């Protein structure tokens, strides 16, 4: 079979930078799926993307589908011939349709009878005749929320399309993509190199674009180049560039020929909290801030331009002029905000509605303050600081800085709290109340911060559930799923001795008569339990392990986590499978018992050696297990219980539990009930698979 390399490129107007990678990856995935469906073999496939193009290259693509034999079954032999042995009309019609005579048909014998059959050879179709349609289907399936039309064309795409190129080796594939006829013409950079040129071979794509068109089409190469050059530029001025991957991705999606330059701003702006300056540089201007070895912001930034200029100083000056007014705004807002304390902003919270039925932001901070103090008292944190931080927690939302630069909420609250002379614990809590902000973010670790963060999230959870607006489907306007995961992570990762039932009840109490849903507390608890399952599944914990712990319904998250870890460890023990099966058997036996389960074991009724041995082993372990359960040392407890395997196996081998003698039967049921209860102190291991 012959092979050749395939290139497909779509030349467009500037594509949305935040969607570029996803579009390219989806194009490749969709097209390779088409190749697989068409039974076209290939070695590998990659995607390329730049602001004005999407491309894929397939290596060693088969030039044709493989020939194959298709079995075409006809009528049963019993109905294919009449009494005289002549072909019936049905048989002749089938044969004629397959281009053969009945005599040329083969016979197929199955367990259901004998059939006429024709093994037809189907020649594979040439790849070049399939490419255009497959590429179009791949493009049609791209994730484009708002397609657009251009000119008089009825075709829709994310941006107007100007060129389409499909090359199989050096051969141009005929056809159209999005209404554009395939041609060798490829467009270069807007302002450098050749505006357009013809591509002779699929393998020349990257090199020709780079040399002739001044375009680096390989997205990953462009990204790596920007990162390396930015790091070098920062090092030259004695600093380190803050190169966040999401920003790097966006910048790489904005340029075809990246040129990294360094600029500066007046040192006076460094008096403004660095977070506000960084937000301006990264969020608004797509610049990379530079920090010294001590982590202090330098009066410099690194930016990426899309052109090699004969006068880079002019480009640098232009970018400095652009960023200066934004930094001046931040400076003005900061200086203006400092004139008023956070406490003085409390009355203004009464003008902002949190939720129609749940009151204003002032109502919310009052609840947060009380709940944070309650939590702090249980965890040993400073309750006075927790109450104060809760009260001030939303006041920075009323500052000019946060109104202009919304992502600085909390952070600016921390800075303003320090300027107001609040305690450091209160100041830090102002920032950490929102943690974790996203998956993988850190959680607060300081006691006061934990109390405020938990109070804020629980107040929202209980309040929204309390007015009957729980998340439905994918809709979650109040980000309750994130809040729930945040509650669990904060408690678990800080090993806080908190019970969800108690916390929910207190939050519900603080809402007073606001809540109309009588089942709110139970619904919030169920919601949090469901988040437990999702969180642990994301961490790679087996569903059966999670269900085994959920069966015991522990409502203390730190305790829940200890049980998960213990059961996960138990599964690694050699005895776990046998004991899980035994517990399942025990559960099934006990489930059939009518009325209350017997609990008292009468030693004199233990007549079999195996039941005597099991009872003795349990009696030996129970004094050791009691303190382990009390101290939540579940892993050690299950490790000890794993030692029961041989005794349990022997019991089921030798002992008839459901004996005819009622006293013996009840005694054995009591023994099994006692055995199961030891494991149930941790989890229902009968659910382990």
From Swiss-Prot:
Any matching Pfam family: DALR_1
Gene Ontology cellular component annotations, sorted alphabetically: cytosol
Main location: cytoplasm
S-S bonds: none
EC number: 6.1.1.14
Keyword Nucleotide-binding: yes
MF terms in GO: arginine-tRNA ligase activity; ATP binding; glycine-tRNA ligase activity
Enzyme's top EC category: ligase
GO biological process entries: arginyl-tRNA aminoacylation; glycyl-tRNA aminoacylation
InterPro entries attached to this UniProt entry: DALR_anticod-bd, Gly-tRNA-synth_bsu, Gly-tRNA-synth_heterodimer
Keywords: Aminoacyl-tRNA synthetase, ATP-binding, Cytoplasm, Ligase, Nucleotide-binding, Protein biosynthesis
Cell compartments where the protein resides: Cytoplasm
Catalytic activities: tRNA(Gly) + glycine + ATP = glycyl-tRNA(Gly) + AMP + diphosphate
PROSITE patterns: AA_TRNA_LIGASE_II_GLYAB
SUPFAM superfamilies linked: HD-domain/PDEase-like (SSF109604)
Assembly, per entry: Tetramer of two alpha and two beta subunits.
NCBIfam families xref list: glyS
Family to which the UniProt record says this protein belongs: Belongs to the class-II aminoacyl-tRNA synthetase family.
Protein's UniProt name: Glycine--tRNA ligase beta subunit
Protein species of origin: Shewanella baltica (strain OS195)
């Amino acid at each position: 079979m012959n092979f050749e390399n395939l290139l497909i490129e779509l030349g467009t107007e500037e594509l949305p930078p935040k969607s570029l990678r996803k579009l390219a990856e989806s194009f490749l995935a969709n097209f390779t799926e088409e190749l697989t469906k068409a039974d076209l073999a290939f070695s590998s496939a990659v995607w390329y993307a730049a602001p004005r193009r999407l491309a894929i290259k397939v290596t060693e693509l088969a030039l044709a589908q493989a020939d194959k034999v298709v079995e075409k079954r006809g009528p049963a032999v019993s109905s294919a011939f009449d009494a005289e042995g002549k072909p019936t009309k049905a048989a002749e019609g089938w044969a004629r349709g397959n281009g053969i005579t009945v005599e040329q048909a083969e016979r197929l014998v199955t367990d259901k009878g004998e059939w006429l059959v024709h093994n037809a050879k189907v020649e594979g179709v040439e790849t070049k005749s399939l490419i255009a349609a497959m590429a179009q289907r791949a493009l049609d399936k791209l994730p484009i929320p708002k397609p657009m039309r251009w000119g008089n064309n009825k075709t829709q795409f994310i941006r107007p399309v100007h060129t389409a190129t499909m090359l199989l080796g050096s051969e141009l594939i005929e056809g159209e993509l999005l209404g554009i006829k395939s041609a060798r013409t490829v467009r270069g950079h807007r302002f450098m190199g050749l505006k357009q040129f013809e591509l002779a071979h699929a393998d020349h794509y990257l090199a020709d674009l780079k040399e002739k068109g001044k375009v680096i089409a390989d997205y990953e190469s462009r990204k790596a180049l920007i990162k390396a050059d930015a790091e070098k530029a920062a090092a030259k001025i004695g600093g380190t560039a803050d190169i966040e991957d999401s920003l790097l991705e966006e910048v790489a999606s904005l340029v075809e020929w990246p040129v990294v330059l360094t600029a500066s701003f007046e040192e006076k702006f460094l008096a403004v909290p660095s977070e506000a300056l960084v937000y301006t540089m990264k969020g608004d201007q797509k610049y990379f801030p530079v920090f010294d070895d001590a982590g202090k912001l330098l009066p410099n930034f690194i930016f990426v331009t899309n052109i090699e200029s004969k006068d880079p100083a002019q480009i640098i000056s232009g970018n400095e002029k652009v960023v200066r007014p934004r930094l001046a705004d931040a400076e003005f807002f900061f200086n203006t905000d400092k004139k008023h304390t956070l406490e003085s902003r409390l009355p203004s919270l009464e003008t902002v509605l949190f939720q129609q039925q749940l009151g204003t932001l002032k109502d919310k901070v009052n609840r947060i303050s009380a709940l944070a103090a309650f939590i702090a008292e249980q965890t040993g944190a400073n309750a006075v600081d927790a109450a104060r931080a809760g009260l001030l927690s939303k006041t920075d939302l009323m500052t000019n800085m946060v109104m202009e630069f919304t992502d600085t909420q909390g952070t600016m609250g921390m800075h303003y709290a320090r300027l107001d002379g609040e305690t450091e614990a209160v100041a830090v809590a102002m920032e950490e109340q929102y943690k974790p902000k996203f998956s993988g973010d850190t959680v607060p670790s300081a006691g006061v911060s934990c109390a405020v963060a938990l109070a804020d999230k629980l107040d929202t959870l209980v309040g929204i559930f309390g007015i009957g607006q729980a998340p439905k489907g994918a809709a979650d306007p109040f980000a309750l799923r994130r809040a729930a995961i945040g509650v669990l992570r904060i408690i678990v990762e800080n090993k806080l001795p908190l019970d969800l039932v108690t916390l929910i009840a207190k939050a519900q109490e603080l809402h007073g008569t606001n809540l109309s849903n009588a089942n709110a507390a139970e619904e919030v608890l169920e919601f949090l339990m469901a988040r437990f399952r999702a969180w642990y599944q994301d961490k790679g914990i087996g569903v059966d392990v999670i269900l085994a712990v959920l069966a015991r319904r522990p409502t203390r998250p730190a305790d829940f986590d200890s049980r998960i870890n213990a059961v996960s460890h138990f599964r690694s023990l050699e005895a776990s499978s046998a004991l899980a099966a035994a517990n399942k058997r025990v559960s099934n036996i006990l489930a059939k018992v009518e009325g209350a389960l017997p609990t008292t074991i009468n030693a004199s009724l233990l007549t079999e050696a195996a039941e005597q041995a099991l009872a003795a082993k349990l009696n030996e372990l129970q004094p050791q297990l009691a303190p382990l359960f009390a101290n939540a040392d579940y892993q050690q407890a299950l490790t000890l219980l794993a030692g029961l395997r041989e005794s349990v196996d022997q019991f089921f081998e030798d002992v008839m539990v459901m004996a005819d003698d009622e006293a013996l039967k009840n005694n054995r049921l009591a023994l099994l009930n006692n055995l199961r209860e030891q494991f149930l102190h941790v989890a229902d291991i009968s659910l382990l698979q």
